[in-house]
């Protein structure tokens, strides 16, 4: 049975519940977003596939706890807080009972007080310390600002400090000695605190609480690393004779209790019922209009998001637009600035917010939004988390963010001050987007996704046992996680970094292992963007390693606050991109290819005339060039070459293949089979993402040979093109062995557990893929089923849609 929507009130489809423009006066600011929803429903009825409403919800309250320190009660009263929400009172009771706790309530429901009250109370009465961990610096700085406000209101004297990479060296000792609450992030704990725990002895000896917020963001490889960092933290705490309590918080996910327990390795109590009041929320599912019925092509989500944001801002509503990439943030920001910021005598009303900007720029955007000086903000998932940007009226999603949980997290940014709000999901041509807006019932009924981590993934675990051995010697029989660490210690001893003697394993190497372990990326090191305009050399942005190949190649247009910079030189080894400001009427988009090779088969099964498999694969991703795309018209005006190192990873995958004899019987040519398998891969990826409720970015697809000799991609016409391992075009007709294979693979090193359940359901996935194609109303294939195509003049039995159906039929039971 599906879990309810991320509010305690159930979400229901209300075909006539949204107010018409005349139902309520637009002059009343409390109903502006509702009135806009009504106007949109009337004016754009043909584009709205789903209309839902969450009614306003009354708050449930509890008095301040009797055992709350009087000074803290006075501080709360000074800030206008004279009672608690019910979940805050429940959290106080649970923490006071000694339980480890996870609080899972909607955005803006007051989760912060769930841990602030016990932490400050303990600091006031027992001089106890607390460590806060947040996934981003912005959240950490928000939290310190909140604690300082509470301190100021009650003259409490509790000392709270951030400890991150920006903390000056001369301030670090004072923080270690005098901080009651130290607010940091997993990376700093991993690299700067645990390896130097002896400098933190006084802090650790008095550590009472460990607060881990936004735990839904700790999933996949990052979450698996963080779980091991917490294992190391508890090991150091035990050395200092303390066993701190955990207080964890999360946005709505499908498995909060299980996920929290996997992170900390201990049982937790879960609080999932929110007592916070909520304003009326309206949700629209928006499918752009069809512009080419034959090909099933629709207007771009970008143009529709731009239109919706313009309408909302012109109506005086504070609006946030979420884009799926940094590039799209800049493109949408430019479009909105062209409308609203054209008058140089008036202050800018539109801002961009994304990773890669300098911290000062992001903090300024946050302050301006809170103060009401910005009418429209365009951001990436960086704004999903709880950064305070004040009250918003409208949230527009430029494309489905990849998960139900992330969708509600983003919609939750509006209506944070209990006013009515509007959220609009604008579907892109991505098949997953189309699947959702065409079946709005799925969106209502779907449970939020499960967060998956694998703390015992061998490479990750070995990395952290190495770090833990540097921090403290291991004793014979000592576990790390649920198992004895001895086999891992023996491996490290063989490499010469550990020495075992007398039941004790000591670190003997000169290296500093934490520096060699990245929690967030396959490889270490962000790239800095250096502006050389006018002969200067100024660092203006940072780009993480995984995005550098797609955004910082030579010739790329790299946009910052919608200002275009051209990349003149990329120093890959030095992690620097040199840019100059430019004036062009286009942006650039990378062209990349993926090839795979099977390393090991874990399991296999018959799948119709073919077979399905689960195993380990080697993935190589190559950026081969880029396209120049003109603003507004979106026409492709040219190409450029890219020469960069290949990006490689080992991961797990599920794959399907059909023997050559069966292919030759089903298809008139190898080219037809290649087209069919590319369409099948597109469709299988869509239904697989939904089946395991994964985020689209966690699961990738590819088509290649069973032996890794070639790979395939769709050309500009949407037809299959075979390429050899050096990336050169090839002809499938000349191959001695032709066994096209569809791969769905975990997008993280070692995998995050997606491929195994997909293999278990391989037959079901093929049936769902066939049903998706059958339900699609296009004639020849389209982005919603088999992928985009540019020509559809073939006979019906030779269209990409028909060929994909034929390929999938070979994989069904005979």
Where are the regions a protein language model picked out?
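Extended, highly charged accessory segments
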Residues: 245-248, 427, 469, 476-552, ...
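Short, mixed charged/polar active-site loops
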Residues: 112, 157, 537-538, 564
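A detector of low-complexity, intrinsically disordered, Ser/Thr/Gly/Pro/Ala-rich segments
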Residues: 8-10, 29, 378
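Generic alpha-helix initiation/capping and coil-helix boundary signal
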Residues: 2-6, 84, 462, 762, ...
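N-terminal amphipathic/basic-hydrophobic helices that include classical n-h-c signal peptides
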Residues: 1-21, 145
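N-terminal accessory nucleic-acid engagement/regulatory domains that precede
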Residues: 12-67, 747-749
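Helicase motor core with emphasis on the C-terminal RecA-like subdomain
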Residues: 39-79, 83-86, 90, 95-190, ...
């Amino acid at each position: 049975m599906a879990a309810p929507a991320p509010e305690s009130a159930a979400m229901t489809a209300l075909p006539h519940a949204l107010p018409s423009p005349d139902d309520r006066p637009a002059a009343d600011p409390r109903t502006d977003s509702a009135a806009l929803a009504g106007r949109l429903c009337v004016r754009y009825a043909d584009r709205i596939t789903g209309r839902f409403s969450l009614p306003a919800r009354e708050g449930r309250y509890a008095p301040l706890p009797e055992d709350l320190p009087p000074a803290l009660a006075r501080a709360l009263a000074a800030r206008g807080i004279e009672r608690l929400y019910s979940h805050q009172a429940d959290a106080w009771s649970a923490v006071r009972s000694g339980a480890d706790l996870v609080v899972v309530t909607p955005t803006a429901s007051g989760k912060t007080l769930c841990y602030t009250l016990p932490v400050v109370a303990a600091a006031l009465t027992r001089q106890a310390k607390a460590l806060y961990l947040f996934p981003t610096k912005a959240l950490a700085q928000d939290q310190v600002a909140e604690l300082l406000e509470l301190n100021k209101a009650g003259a409490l004297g509790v000392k709270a400090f951030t400890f991150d990479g920006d903390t000056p060296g001369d301030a670090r000792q004072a923080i270690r000695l005098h901080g009651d609450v130290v607010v940091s992030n997993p990376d700093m704990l991993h690299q700067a605190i645990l390896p130097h725990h002896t400098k933190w002895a006084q802090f650790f000896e008095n550590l009472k609480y460990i607060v881990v917020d936004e735990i839904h963001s700790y999933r996949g490889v990052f979450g698996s690393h963080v779980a091991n960092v917490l294992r190391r933290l508890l090991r150091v705490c035990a050395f200092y004779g303390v066993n701190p309590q955990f207080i964890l918080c999360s946005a709505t996910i499908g498995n909060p209790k299980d996920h929290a327990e996997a992170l900390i390795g201990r049982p937790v109590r879960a609080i999932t019922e929110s007592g916070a009041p909520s304003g009326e929320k309206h949700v629209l599912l928006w499918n752009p209009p069809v512009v080419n019925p034959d090909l099933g092509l629709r207007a771009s989500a970008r143009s529709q998001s731009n239109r919706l944001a313009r309408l909302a801002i012109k109506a005086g509503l504070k609006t946030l637009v979420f884009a799926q990439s940094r590039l799209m943030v800049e493109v949408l920001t430019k479009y909105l600035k062209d409308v609203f910021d054209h008058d140089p005598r008036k202050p800018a009303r539109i801002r961009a917010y994304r990773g890669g900007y300098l911290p000062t720029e992001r903090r300024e955007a946050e302050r301006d939004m809170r103060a009401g000086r910005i009418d429209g903000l365009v951001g990436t998932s960086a704004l999903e988390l709880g950064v305070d940007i004040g009250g918003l009226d409208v949230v527009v999603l430029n494309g489905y963010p990849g998960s139900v949980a992330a969708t509600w997290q983003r919609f939750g940014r509006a209506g944070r001050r209990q006013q009515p709000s509007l959220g609009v999901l604008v579907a892109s041509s991505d098949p997953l987007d189309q699947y959702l807006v065409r079946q709005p019932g799925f969106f209502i009924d779907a449970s939020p996704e499960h967060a998956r981590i694998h703390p015992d993934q061998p490479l990750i675990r070995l990395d952290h046992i190495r770090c833990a051995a540097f921090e403290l010697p291991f004793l014979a029989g000592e576990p790390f996680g649920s198992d004895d660490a001895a086999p891992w210690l023996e491996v490290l001893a063989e490499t010469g970094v550990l020495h075992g003697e007398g039941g004790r394993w000591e670190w003997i190497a000169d290296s500093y292992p934490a520096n060699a372990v990245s929690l967030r990326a396959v490889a270490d090191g962000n790239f800095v963007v250096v502006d050389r305009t006018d002969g200067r050399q100024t660092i203006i942005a940072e780009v993480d390693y995984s995005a550098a190949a797609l955004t910082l190649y030579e010739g790329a247009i790299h946009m910052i606050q919608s200002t275009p910079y051209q990349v003149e030189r990329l120093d890959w080894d030095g992690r620097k991109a040199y840019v100059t400001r430019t004036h062009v009427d286009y942006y650039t988009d990378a062209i990349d290819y993926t090839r795979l090779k099977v390393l090991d088969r874990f399991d296999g099964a018959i799948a119709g005339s073919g077979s399905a498999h689960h195993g380990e694969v080697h993935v190589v991703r190559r950026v081969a060039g880029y396209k120049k795309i003109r603003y507004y018209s979106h026409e492709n005006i040219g190409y450029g070459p890219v020469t960069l190192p290949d990006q490689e990873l080992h991961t797990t995958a599920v794959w399907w293949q059909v023997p050559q004899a069966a292919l030759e019987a089903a298809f008139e040519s190898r080219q037809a089979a290649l087209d069919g398998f590319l369409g099948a891969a597109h469709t299988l990826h869509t239904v697989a993402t939904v089946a395991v409720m994964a985020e689209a970015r966690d699961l990738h697809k590819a088509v290649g040979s069973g032996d890794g000799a070639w790979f395939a991609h769709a050309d500009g016409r949407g037809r299959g093109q075979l390429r050899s391992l050096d990336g050169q075009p090839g002809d499938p007709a000349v191959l001695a062995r032709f066994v096209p294979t569809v791969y769905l693979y975990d997008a993280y090193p070692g995998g995050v557990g997606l491929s195994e359940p997909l293999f278990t359901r391989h037959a079901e996935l093929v049936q769902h893929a066939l049903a998706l194609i059958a339900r699609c109303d296009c004639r020849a294939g389209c982005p919603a089923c088999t992928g985009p195509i540019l020509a559809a003049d073939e006979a019906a039995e030779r269209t990409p849609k028909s060929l994909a159906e034929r390929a999938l039929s070979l994989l069904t039971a005979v």
